[in-house]
């Protein structure tokens, strides 16, 4: 019983850490302003992402990692 409880706590801690890291990565990418979608892919690639498009005058970067 104690082992399964410990494993559950470790799993939840890992998931929280991953969620926080993804949120920070998204916040960095969201700071890129744009006017049209053609200007986003190069800016997103410079951030380490594979693609991006302009949404609400901010670049939305995809496949970051």
UniProtKB/Swiss-Prot annotation:
The record marks 62 as: Aromatic residue of the functional dyad. Disulfide bonds join 34-54, 40-59, 44-61, 49-64. The modification Cysteine amide is found at residue 64. The record marks 53 as: Basic residue of the functional dyad. Transmembrane segments: none annotated. Keywords: Amidation, Disulfide bond, Ion channel impairing toxin, Potassium channel impairing toxin, Secreted, Signal, Toxin, Voltage-gated potassium channel impairing toxin. One of its GO terms (cellular component) is extracellular region. It is found in: Secreted. InterPro entries: Scorpion_toxin-like_sf, Scorpion_toxinS_K_inh. Voltage-gated potassium channel inhibitor. Selectively and reversibly binds (Kd=0.77 nM) and blocks hKv1.3/KCNA3 potassium channels of human T-lymphocytes. Also shows a very weak effect on hKv1.2/KCNA2 (Kd=7.1 uM). Also reduces the fraction of CD40L expressing T cells that are stimulated by alphaCD3/alphaCD28. Has the CSalpha/beta fold, which comprises one or two short alpha helices connected to anti-parallel beta-sheets stabilized by three or four disulfide bonds. Negative results: has very weak or no effect on many potassium channels (hKCa1.1/KCNMA1, hKCa3.1/KCNN4/IK/SK4, hKv1.1/KCNA1, hKv1.4/KCNA4, hKv1.5/KCNA5, rKv2.1/KCNB1, and hKv11.1/KCNH2/ERG1), and on the tested sodium channel (hNav1.5/SCN5A). This is Toxin VmKTx1. It comes from Vaejovis mexicanus smithi (Mexican scorpion).
